[in-house]
């Protein structure tokens, strides 16, 4: 089979095809693997496929971010996915995989005024010094792959763009 499957945000869409899919585009492969390509675990050759939830790298040989997949040579543990990354508003398309907004992304006007951190696994409300977004008052929002990260902030966020709201939201608002 050489046909290609339609993309989706979960790798399960390639279950019955000779395709390895990402959230952005499908890729046709020449032969069907003996292991179905519908789970992140199918990347046994140090090559991973991305997903929209960074938890997909928990037990695979992949390290994924919201932005792009990165192949590694050994299966990673949850701790290897804890590299802080910047808000999408901080460095444009280089939103993930940076050591910190302040140092890796620089402190130019294009990066100010948000300097937030999050891990690939669990969004936190930990902000670097000077992390203030005037439209959020004294609170600072940070991105995650699930809007639930707005539970304790005055922001409603998505994987791509944080949006401030006028009052602190409850889990139900997400």
UniProtKB/Swiss-Prot annotation:
Sequence repeats lie at residues 8-12, 13-17, 18-22, 37-41, 42-46, 51-55, 61-65, 66-70, 75-79, 80-84, 85-89, 90-94, 95-99, 144-148, 149-153, 154-158, 168-172. Signal peptide: none annotated. The keyword Repeat applies. It comes from the Eukaryota. The keyword Repeat applies. Keywords: Keratin, Repeat. Belongs to the KRTAP type 9 family. This is Keratin-associated protein 9-2.
């Amino acid at each position: 089979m050489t046909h290609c499957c339609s993309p989706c945000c979960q790798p399960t869409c390639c279950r019955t095809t000779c395709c390895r899919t990402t959230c952005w585009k499908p890729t046709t492969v020449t032969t069907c693997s003996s292991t179905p390509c519908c789970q992140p675990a199918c990347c046994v050759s140090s090559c991973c496929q991305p997903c929209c939830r960074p938890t997909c790298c928990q037990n695979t040989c992949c390290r994924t971010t919201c932005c792009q997949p990165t192949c590694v040579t050994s299966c990673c543990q949850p701790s290897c996915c804890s590299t802080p990354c910047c808000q999408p508003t901080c460095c444009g398309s280089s939103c993930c995989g940076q050591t910190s907004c302040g140092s890796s992304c620089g402190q130019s006007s294009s990066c100010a005024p948000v300097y937030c951190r999050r891990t690939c696994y669990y969004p936190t409300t930990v902000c670097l010094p000077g992390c203030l977004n005037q439209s959020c008052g004294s609170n600072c929002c940070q991105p995650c792959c699930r809007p639930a990260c707005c539970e304790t902030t005055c922001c409603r966020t998505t994987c791509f763009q944080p949006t401030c709201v006028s009052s602190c939201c409850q889990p139900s608002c997400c």
